[in-house]
């Protein structure tokens, strides 16, 4: 079930898979759409009179739909349907935006977020599967590029939404985003299926949770998304408490996310060169130490500077976790494993956001960030143990067929 190559070798030869450009563009557009939705939540509350609970219901519904889609739809990408899933996800995203544009009642917005969340959970694993198996020699670079387009869209979305809302209001923004996404449909029809092995036995999720190193990779993923959940729950509130204006918050969020988008391709190359496990554990270990100081540094400027510094480390380490997941399964299970990984991300982020918000409300930011760091350290340690190969050699995934060393039996 595994193949090997000489120690230290690197897969060579020209890429034989499909063009990745449609996958990059569409993920960028959908991430920009998600970013625009998030930044307009306060506008919906103020203009339509929704309660905080109602807004929370809409947000939670979107995450729940993405969680379900990742588990239900991802296996289909392993059966040669990735291009169709990309088109379906994009069409659903357009429909979700239209629902948000015409909605009047809370349930309209809950429905819109459910549709858009399901769209993300449908297109995401399809894109990851194709990027992973299309060009083994440049796996790290391509996963890094996918992450860069993904994060770049999420950064661009709020900026675009702010400008459009200033011109024509929040409904105009949703209509404009729906139009922009619909313009990507011709690009979606250019997406071609990969030529890698497919899940002919229709195994789906069966057996994946018996793979020790895949479970370990999920623990490492969970460690990172404890940090993400804590960030979403605490960072903006703490910046507001320290006196940051709306404008400063917007600039800080953009500047804080840019290093991830800019450095992810290089981070992927380095992770493939030095080993995905080593790179993931090392980068997350550094982030864990840095998080402790988030509750110590004084003032708005100090917190922004530390956020940017942490983001630089995130950028270098961002591609290594999906690479570690990719290294734990054969090529015909890639989309399913990546979908399960996204489900772990969503679930961990949601639980962490709730738990750390409670800690922050009761004890302040210093205790909240220390709690985050301790939780990350525990999960990361478990993941490092479970992903450790018996021969102690670096995990350098060259997925799918020219693997340097595959960490499962």
Spans of features found by a protein language model:
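Juxtamembrane intracellular "pre-TM" segments in multi-pass secondary transporters
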Residues: 2-17, 191-218, 400-408
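Helix-loop boundary and gating motifs at the non-cytosolic
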Residues: 14-63, 216, 225-242
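Interfacial helix-cap and linker-helix signal at transmembrane-aqueous boundaries
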Residues: 45, 76-77, 163-168, 239-240, ...
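Central cavity-lining transmembrane alpha-helices of secondary-active solute carriers
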Residues: 60-73, 254-266
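Conserved MFS/SLC helix-loop-helix module at the cytosolic interface between two early adjacent transmembrane helices
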Residues: 67-101, 271
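Cytoplasmic helix-loop-helix junction between adjacent transmembrane helices
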Residues: 112-150
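C-terminal membrane-cytosol helix-exit motif in multi-pass small-molecule transporters
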Residues: 178-197, 382-387
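A late C-terminal transmembrane helix in Major Facilitator Superfamily
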Residues: 334-362
